[in-house]
Amino acid sequence: MRTIFTFILLLVTFNVIADDLLWIKLQQDPNMVVLMRNTESSGNKDGSNMLVWDETGNCVGESKLTKDGKAHANRIGEAFARHGITPLAISSPMCRCTETAKIAFEEYVTDPDLRQSASSNSQGQQKFLTRATNLLLEYRGKTPIAFVNHGPNIDSLTMELLNPGEMLVGSVNESGEVEVLGKIRIE
């Protein structure tokens, strides 16, 4: 029993140290990016309306953040503030992402090509990859980027699977590709 407790304690300590190192990189290193899915939305819970997008910005028919999702986005914003980091946020135009970005970071930029499309829509996926890469290249620099988007899109950029609200930390190279450094989880 004592061995198991010690192992768990070491594992927790290692995760805290790893998170701290990633926060330091975000504070100090250029060309950093945090890729994250939107926090919990109605669609994450029941699978409905995940591809619906109201181009007017009124969110009609779209999946929206739950109460827990809004609270989680707020905790993410607080974590960035505690570490003295004010990122430039880039968001999918779909409401669950713009809500996450607005609550966590207040201001954000968006583009219609950053939305989620059906996995069978290879043209939509290619538009996303091209636009995301161009935006990462355009905004890479001293200020870290917070890229709020959808699981399938982040997976296509990084080959990493994320849970809602989980954050993937990386650096953007000269080609606009993301070199993954690790994950930060804020409960």
Predicted regions and their residues:
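N-terminal signal peptide c-region/cleavage motif recognized by signal peptidases
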Residues: T13-N15
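Charged, low-complexity C-terminal accessory regions
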Residues: G124-P164
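Positively charged n-region of N-terminal signal peptides that target proteins for export
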Residues: M1-I4
